[in-house]
Every structure is written in C-alpha cells, then in structure tokens.
Amino acid sequence: MISSPSTPATFAAGSLVLLCLVLGGGHFALAQKEGNDDIQHYTADDCQVTPVIHVLQYPGCVPKPIPSFACVGRCASYIQVSGSKIWQMERSCMCCQESGEREASVSLFCPKAKNGEKKFKKVSTKAPLECMCRPCTGIEDANVIPQELAAFADDGTLTSYFQKGQLRNSE
C-alpha cells in the first residue's frame, strides 16, 4: 500500500511491516507508529527545504561560505508481505529529494592566479527549489538478503513451513 505524502499509510495489525532507515544528510529517521492495536498508522513524511551554509571551493581561490538550501527530512518507507501473493514482498522506499532547482553565480577571489588570469573566478552553484518524498533508487532483488541468511528469522509458522518445504525438495 503506497500513500500520498499527506495521507498516512494504514496496515492491519497482522501484516508484516518492516520500516527501513533513511539516511539523508547525516540524519536517521524512523517512522512514528500511532494508533490502537487493531490498526496502525505510520506518519513519517517530513521533507522540507532547509537553509544551510554551503562553502564554495575552487583550486587556487579563497573558499567562500554562501547561504543556500538543502532537502532535509524523513519519508515513510516499508516492506511487507504482498496481500495477494504471500510469497512476494512489496517495497516502498521513499527519500527526501529535490523537486526543481535554482541556480546562482558567485564570484570567488583567487589570489594565486597566474599572470594573465583573472583574480576573480565566476562559479555556478545549484540548490533545491522545493523538496518532496520521492522513490529512492531501486533495490535489486539480488541485493536483498533473506532473513534466514541475515540471522533475523524466528521460529514462527512461516519459517518452519519454508524449512520443511526445502527439506522435501532436497529429498
């Protein structure tokens, strides 16, 4: 189930739901769980344009701090067993990313400029115009480690079922 950024996702209490941590700009964010025992709502979308100081650097020039913007926040992500095909997983990994960009030109002072070169270097920089939760880079199925290999599996009903199924196939 994928929800729009303004609508919280809703999962039945019996659903297997694992939330992935989103790393963005050095911040870790995990969705907050709200609701009663029957229905759980995960509301985590909080992706905003944030003012930052960006230091522009160019070889031979004096670094120049300038006011800029960055996308900072958290977005809801999950992995769950498919409702229609219980042998498959449904994933939704969302990341706080730019939606449009602005460009600016800045002059840097370059005291080590050689003869004939200008003492000021004009450089271009970009910053996000707006930010929103968008799908992260796709995950290759080959990169997903099964729970049994990652040592996270418990002795639940499904784990026992799959182990028995593997034994029957190997006989």
From Swiss-Prot:
The Gene Ontology biological process annotation of the record reads: animal organ morphogenesis; chitin-based cuticle sclerotization; cuticle pigmentation; sequestering of BMP from receptor via BMP binding
Compartment(s) where it occurs, according to its Swiss-Prot or TrEMBL record: Secreted
InterPro entries named in the record: Cys_knot_C, Cystine-knot_cytokine, DAN
Q: Is Secreted found in the keyword set?
A: yes
* Primary localization: secreted
The CTCK domain covers 47-137
Q: List the disulfide bonds.
A: 47-96, 61-110, 71-131, 75-133, 93-136
Give a yes or no for keyword ATP-binding in this entry.
Answer: no
Keyword set, alphabetical order: Disulfide bond, Hormone, Secreted, Signal
The entry's other comment says: The bursicon gene is encoded by two loci: burs124 contains exons 1, 2 and 4, and burs3 contains exon 3. Exon 3 is trans-spliced into position in the mature transcript. This unusual gene arrangement has existed for at least the 150 million years (MY) of mosquito evolution since the split of the culicid and anophelid family lineages, but is younger than the 250 MY split of the dipteran suborders Nematocera and Brachycera (containing the Culicidea and Drosophilidae, respectively).
Q: How does it assemble?
A: Heterodimer of burs and pburs.
Role description: Final heterodimeric neurohormone released at the end of the molting cycle, involved in the sclerotization (tanning) of the insect cuticle, melanization and wing spreading.
Protein name per its UniProtKB record: Bursicon
The organism's lineage? Answer: Eukaryota, Metazoa, Ecdysozoa, Arthropoda, Hexapoda
Q: Source gene?
A: burs124
